[in-house]
Amino acid sequence: MSAASPLRWQLTEHAPLRALNTFHVDATARWLLNIHAPEALPDALAAPQIAGQPLLVLGSGSNVLLAGDPPGCVLCFDNRDITIIAHHADHAIVRAGAGVNWHGLVMYSLQQGLSGLENLALIPGTVGACPIQNIGAYGAQVSDFIHVVEAYDRGSQQFVRMTPAECAFGYRDSVFKQQPDRYLIVAVEFNLPLLHELRLDYAGIRDELARMGAELAGAADVAQAVINIRQRKLPDPEVLGNAGSFFKNPLLPSEQIAALQASFADMPVFPGEQPGQGKLSAAWLIEQCGWKGKREGDAGISEAHALVLVNHGSASGAQLLAFARQVAESVRERYSVILEPEPRVIGAHW
């Protein structure tokens, strides 16, 4: 059964979600709300079938583990427009709808001669999801280039324009993650430079550029290098169900880092997000505990990258979650370091 306002929104009952999550686990939405025109949100949310119900927003389902059926209503944004709304001498403002494919936006910006997003190429997901996690990779994070986040505030029942400061961005964090039931992101405006200093901090990118023969690398070359690396390291979700990196790299006080290095001299440490803080490699910790390439039933860790939880076929969300908990517990027992998941876990507690 479905209800709709022509061309603006559609509501479907008992909708299967297997095709809407990259782990390819079975789950069912009591109601699935597709939003074609964001301005229709207030009317759609007032529909009697879903009014007052919990909402779960799914982009491409690439940052969620459905460990059970989500309560209430699942919402998908289908607005996929990209517009350059302002040109300046050294930068442009690009607006993208929440339903735009993230990698598609990265490639579009490069085709327009704009830079900034190249290190974030091939990250799965949609534009609407990118501010929630403050997605990042290879030394860059999306908050560095966000101009405004356009959202619907369910508290005030108003559309709002939020500056980066109001978004409270942190390492894989934001106000949208801290208050998941308040804001519905409908579009994002990006401030993208025509030229900027390339981020080549990671040796892997420099090595890949050398392999490509890109001696005077530009932003498009960096994007291609990132694509090459990610395709080698990360399994294609269409072939092997996964959500990319499943665990966050732990941020710890410098004193705890020093104590760990005293016991484990070969432990790699990276600069933290703040003074007095360091970052550990979750992949290294997991690999040292012997989990890389292991599996139980159809739940496992990728053979290529220890951060990637994979579904080899028919694992349920609950089975994947149980396996991930085993991995995290073994790291805690050996290193006294607590691993946290990057994806949002639905239907169970971490």
UniProtKB/Swiss-Prot annotation:
Its main location: cytoplasm. Signal peptide: none annotated. Its EC number is 1.3.1.98. Gene3D superfamilies: 3.30.465.10, UDP-N-acetylenolpyruvoylglucosamine reductase, C-terminal domain, Uridine Diphospho-n-acetylenolpyruvylglucosamine Reductase, domain 2. Residues 24-195 form the FAD-binding PCMH-type domain. GO terms for biological process: cell division; cell wall organization; peptidoglycan biosynthetic process; regulation of cell shape. The active site is at 172, 245 (proton donor), 342. It catalyses: UDP-N-acetyl-alpha-D-muramate + NADP(+) = UDP-N-acetyl-3-O-(1-carboxyvinyl)-alpha-D-glucosamine + NADPH + H(+). Cell wall formation. Belongs to the MurB family. PANTHER family: UDP-N-ACETYLENOLPYRUVOYLGLUCOSAMINE REDUCTASE (PTHR21071:SF4). This is UDP-N-acetylenolpyruvoylglucosamine reductase. The lineage of its organism: Bacteria, Pseudomonadati, Pseudomonadota, Gammaproteobacteria, Lysobacterales. The gene is murB.
